[in-house]
């Protein structure tokens, strides 16, 4: 899947210590490709959800200590499995991301801020929490602050992309 993204990730990843970069790249690749499955292209919803379920099966295989046997996904999930094992990353955070991306496939509007906040809890906050795990810095205070930052960045992204999202039939502003 080839989609251009206007993100700062390539530059930001250079600011990470070299020992963390492979794990950061694996997390990013997982999140970026799963989000693209949900949001990009013209595949029907049933196909998008099936691909996201392939990601769920791969995560389950990682939890069981097994290799994922899909040759197309094996490189991504082999790298992710190494990062999960090396840093003790909670697989549930990756599931939260997949739940949010699956929600993107069918949900186009949010009734209120509480509903939108719940979406941010699953679509943005897991990334900050995973980074805190990499740095072994997941104190309650850090987790709370990370969640605030990640939710804020997600909301800013929604406001920046209002026109693009409206063209796709999605409205994130309650």
Where do the protein language model's features map onto the residues?
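Acidic catalytic motifs of isoprenoid enzymes
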Residues: 1-174
